[in-house]
Amino acid sequence: MADKLRTPPSTESANGRHPSEPEKQWTDTTLSNALANSPERPIGAPTGTNLDEHGQARYTTISGRPVRRLYTPADLPPDWNYDQYLGYPGQPPYTRGIHATGYRGKLWTMRQFSGFASPEETNQRYKELLAHGAGGLSVAFDLPTLMGYDSDHPFSEGEVGKCGVAIDSLEDMEILFDGIRLQDITTSMTINSPASILWAMYLVVAEKQGADWKKISGTLQNDVLKEYLAQKEYIYPPAPSMRLVIDTFEFGSKFTPRFNTISISGYHIREAGSTALQELAFTIYDGIEYVEWALRRGLDIDEFGPRLSFFFNAHNDFFEEIAKYRAARKIWYRLMRDRFHAKQERTRLMRFHTQTAGVSLTAQQPLNNIARVAIQALAAVLGGTQSLHTDSYDEALALPTAEAARISLRTQQIIAYESGVANTIDPLGGSYFVERATLDMEDGAFDYFEKLDTLGGMVNAIEKGFPQKEIAEASYQYQRAVEAREKVIVGVNEFTVDEEPPHILYIDESIREKQSAKLSLLRAQRSNDEVRRTLDALKRAAAQEPRVKPDGSISDANTMPYIIEAVRAYATVGEICEALREVYGAYEETSVA
């Protein structure tokens, strides 16, 4: 199947080049003379450690893909033509973007990921970001919330409010968005295993504000597959986790048509050490898996498909990243059209958010990270992202200070309003280097798709450890190259200095006690009988097999309505997750040999 969906004909390797006579003459004369007089600079530090078997410098991308000295028409397929391989923005195959006017019509959304300590403190940060021009909000939750534990659970000790905001109940969500009209903004929530619970809280807060669910918009990350692949913040086994995701697809297509019910995330796969190609391939194949599970439920692809969104990383290798984004749109279009037979054009569009690479930030000389983030953000923009988060320079050390967060937002604004890159669409389109890299990304992704198809899909591949092994090997090879100084990390393995530790944000250790006291008061004041009733109803629904009804209405076993009722009764995140654990059990990863 995968091979049939490639761009015809399958792209040629660099070994199949047929240079023109002028290129041959240039190689034999101008280039040859230049190399004789001045050899190319070595790669690596300090005198060149990245050499091939002939002692020549080996130029590669960060992912290790070879980079030629020069790209010409000879690096493209012999039948390469503009209409077949590129097309126009806003038209298939969307290589050049999904909007006909690019950023001239609308700039990307500047969506800064933020959340720390208490809901009260994060609420103030959100108001600051909105006041400084942020176009949307992106919620970072703390580790206990991500893992489905309340702040007063023993497992939560030492982690409450550390890497995001602590949300235990609807009361916390009400505080988080106090004074912020949810119908007037878009919100992205980075939450996965407990995603349906936090989304239910968001919907109830919107309801209490008088908002129409059909008019609110935002994005729920809700990508459990990448938890097994990379981030490891899973709760339930894969099958019931997938069932919960499809419940949100079904519910969202009926009641929240403007809300993206998933953000299929390559970001964390890249942060775990994958190459750019692996990020692209595994992310899109995760999307394939979600679509297939939804279709088996009986959902209509043209109902839930338009609400599928993606989330990619922006790493340091400028052109490799741009090629990745361009290839992603092209691949998704072809898959939705030819593999899943989506009829509506909007179902075939890939919309994606991008975040600059947290893993690239260095604790040493942290101000250097401002430059790294700017380069990464520019790549995301030139690749056509719909929204963007720029990391703060101090995030290798702690959650960002208010000043660092403001600089990261200003970085986007300078790119948008001062650089001129938003004035024309896909300005790197037609570059022989970029087009060759885009084709290579596409071809490499389909190679991975064939392997994953053979393994029986992503869930089966995860259980067999295939993608985990691929990521682990790529991570090892990258770290080996850094330690061998084949790859230079400025300020880490080259150009180092002694420096004073910077000012960083510290989280008040009393946050756990405050959240625990709030929980005690909540449990004393709510109707605990109502909490028990709603949780029992949820467990009964979770134990049933959901199927779409003949009239198209949602299944009686869809868990979302039951979770919403539990949230309205002020059941906590931990209580709802524990109810589902009683039905589904907890997942324990086996070691991958």
Language-model segment annotations:
Residues 259, 300-304, 342-356, 364-393, ...:
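Flexible glycine/proline-rich, aromatic-decorated loop/lid segments
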Residues 154, 198-205, 227-231, 245, ...:
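Short alpha-helical interface elements
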Residues 4, 18, 22, 28, ...:
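Flexible, glycine-rich loop/tail regions that form catalytic "lids" or insertion modules at the edges
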